[in-house]
Amino acid sequence: MSPTGTPATPALRHRTVLLDEAVDALVWRPDGVYVDGTFGRGGHSRAVLARLGPDGALVAFDKDPAAIAEAGTIKDARFSIEHASFAAMAERLSGRGHVAGVLLDLGISSPQIDEAARGFSFRFEGPLDMRMDTTRGITAAQWLAQADEQDIARVIRDYGEERFAVQIAKAIVARRSEPGDGGPIATTADLAALVAKAVKTREKGQDPATRTFQALRIHVNQELEDLERGLKAAYELLQVGGRLVVISFHSLEDRIVKRFMAAHARPQQDADPALRRAPLRAADLPQPTLRLLGRYKPGPEEVAANPRARSAVMRVAEKLAPAATTAGGGARA
């Protein structure tokens, strides 16, 4: 997918980031059941299906009704789609047993950015919606019209890493009571103009509204909460040898993914210090349950062809068998 920002030219539409690398890392047995947690416009799903044998299966998830409609064009008995967040995969797949791999391609897709009515981009005039699932939840405009100044500042600071969050929040709240053309912010252009006045210094090559739009999108869609829930669900669903492949587009996402994988790959580092000081064998400490298989970035050719891929980071991990234990509960040496 992609971060919020520059509009796509027609040549850049529907370009799936790290397509071959992600599918190579994900599919290790052609008869396995796989999960594409973010169908989008189906780039990864179609490539996974091409790798599967007749007994393989792919279950995709997406919040976006437009993605669900696109999934309907795939006529393959091995494929099914769930209109839900990938955070719900544990409940939705409870009767299918373990899976061979889970792919999460985070962020927002080019078609979502480029459709003005969705309200994701400051470069297109449109209603300030920002919901990935337009059938439920409140819009960004509705939230900004009712949230207090402290909450708005917190969201913009924490999710947008915006140092002018307080000034932006003050301006948003003050705008509600302005006469004439004032009142609650309703459009992308309204918000972009307000932020441009509140942000005193500008980062080179970045619109001053970039961080605020990112923050509101993350908040409205509960993206980081969904990511944490989805990682836990994926881990529980994976069979031994199963692959977890996650593509992120900004530091907040990547930090969560990195910490989650590291906690399962190097649990001894996170063990209670008192436990680490106790006279125990290394085998008696928490044992790894994931193996880190690498961190990947798009190459120069992909970035040149698709500038939105520049910030992508892909992390891959493999589920390990639980350590065998003795009758007394300690791990066998």
From Swiss-Prot:
Its EC number is 2.1.1.199. One of its GO terms (biological process) is rRNA base methylation. Specifically methylates the N4 position of cytidine in position 1402 (C1402) of 16S rRNA. Gene3D superfamilies: Putative methyltransferase TM0872, insert domain, Vaccinia Virus protein VP39. It comes from Cupriavidus necator (strain ATCC 17699 / DSM 428 / KCTC 22496 / NCIMB 10442 / H16 / Stanier 337). Its main location: cytoplasm. One of its GO terms (cellular component) is cytoplasm. This is Ribosomal RNA small subunit methyltransferase H.
